[in-house]
């Protein structure tokens, strides 16, 4: 149990957090606060998960459409967090795009199912395979039907790139609905991942069902109001714990203090972690162990039932025939250059190989880097315009 002294510290921290101006945690509220119009839409997948999308509508009807899809433990909030003139969603909106931001099952905005409450284990019985097979296609279909467009452009970060490739592997008919796909920090092959956390734990947790046995197939890194308020206060730029908060980010994606604005830390804590399943994390650990881009490994007992073989089949990258543009960093601990280039060499329509011209560019710089516009977003916009 916590002693009186510890309780006092926690209450003091929470009191300070609640007394000051709290960072906005809701994506739609943030967009309005930044001076943009916003719409909230929902779609139900064919397996009954209810997903929420955020849209920054265009000023003119018939504008070209872009879908932004987040990484693991993230949400639509990441695309607007850095504010006007810096965040990708606003940059694309200012350029005349109809901007839609998806949310995968299990995150802050998509914790809903037609039949299952989130406290049932079965709700969390999915990996990013299901996000690619069900969530992304449902999101695309809804957007195209709502806007009357036949195609859209896709931008994904991290797991948002993974699920795009899964969709194309398993549902190649969606190639016809994509003008171009821009993959930031593309996560497919991950055998050379440098993240010390992954390298330490993946050999154990990446064994079939190992992590599920240890943790339970439930939410990975669940958050609540208490944790959020505590994180916001501890991660303020003036906090003595600010460096600890920054190091948490660096340990995941690579050290790059030049691209991290400490003033952004408390805003990151207001929106992240946004929710994911244990199996999503386990699936990435399996990718590191196997050095393959393949389906979820249930074990030699269940795999024959699921796949008709003892090992899970590889995803069919040859099916990703819509133009794919790769953007990656030399200091990305999650997506190593050699892994990205293996992906590049297997894509049938690789339209751009873009190594960010900043030596220390890390995995999370794609969404939170202070110079993301200069080094990445300007190039993304230029390439997108070439497909209109």
Feature annotation, model-predicted:
Residues 2-19:
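Cleavable N-terminal signal peptides of Sec/SRP-targeted secreted and luminal proteins
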Residues 30, 45, 52-116:
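Short, surface-exposed "cap/lid" segments of acyl-processing enzymes
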Residues 121-146:
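Alpha/beta-hydrolase active-site loop
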Residues 134, 138, 152, 156-166:
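Glycine-rich nucleophile elbow surrounding the catalytic serine of serine-hydrolase chemistry
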Residues 145-150, 161-305:
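Alpha/beta-hydrolase-fold enzymes
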Residues 320, 325-328, 332:
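Short beta-strand/loop motif that positions the catalytic acidic residue
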Residues 322, 336-346:
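Short alpha-helix in the alpha/beta-hydrolase fold that links the catalytic acid
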Residues 351-388:
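Catalytic active-site module of serine/aspartate enzymes centered on a nucleophile-bearing elbow/loop
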């Amino acid at each position: 149990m916590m002693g009186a002294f510890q309780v006092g510290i926690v209450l003091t921290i929470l009191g300070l957090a609640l007394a000051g101006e709290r960072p906005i945690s809701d994506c739609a509220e943030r967009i309005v606060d930044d001076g943009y119009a916003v719409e909230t839409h929902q779609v139900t997948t064919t397996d009954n998960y209810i997903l929420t999308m955020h849209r920054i509508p265009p000023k003119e009807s018939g504008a070209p459409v872009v879908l932004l899809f987040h990484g693991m433990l993230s949400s639509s909030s990441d695309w607007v967090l850095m504010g006007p003139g810096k965040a990708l969603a606003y940059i694309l909106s200012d350029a005349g795009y109809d901007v839609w931001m998806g949310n995968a099952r299990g995150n802050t905005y998509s914790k809903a199912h037609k039949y299952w409450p989130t406290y049932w284990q079965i709700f969390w019985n999915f990996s990013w395979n299901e996000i690619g097979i069900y969530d992304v296609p449902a999101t695309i279909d809804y957007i195209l039907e709502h806007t009357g467009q036949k195609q859209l452009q896709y931008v994904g970060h991290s797991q948002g790139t993974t699920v795009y490739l899964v969709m194309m592997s398993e549902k190649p008919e969606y190639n016809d609905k994509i003008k171009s796909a821009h993959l930031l920090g593309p996560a497919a092959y991950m055998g050379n991942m440098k993240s010390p956390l992954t390298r330490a734990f993946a050999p154990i947790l990446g064994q079939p069902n190992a992590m599920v046995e240890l943790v339970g197939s439930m939410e990975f890194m669940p958050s609540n109001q208490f944790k959020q308020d505590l994180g916001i206060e501890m991660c303020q730029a003036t906090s003595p714990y600010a460096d600890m908060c920054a190091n948490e980010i660096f340990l995941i994606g690579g050290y790059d203090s030049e691209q991290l604005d400490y003033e952004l830390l408390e805003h990151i804590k207001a929106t992240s972690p946004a929710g994911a399943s244990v199996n999503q994390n386990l699936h990435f650990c399996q990718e590191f162990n196997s050095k393959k881009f393949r389906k979820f490994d249930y074990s030699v007992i269940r795999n024959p039932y699921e796949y008709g073989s003892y090992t899970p089949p590889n995803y069919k990258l040859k099916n990703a025939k819509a133009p794919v543009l790769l953007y990656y960093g030399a200091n990305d601990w999650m997506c190593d250059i050699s892994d990205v280039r293996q992906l590049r060499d297997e894509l049938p329509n690789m339209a751009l190989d873009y190594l960010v011209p900043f030596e220390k560019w890390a995995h999370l710089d794609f969404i939170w880097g202070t110079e993301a516009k200069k080094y990445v977003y300007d190039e993304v916009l230029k390439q997108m315009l070439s497909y209109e």
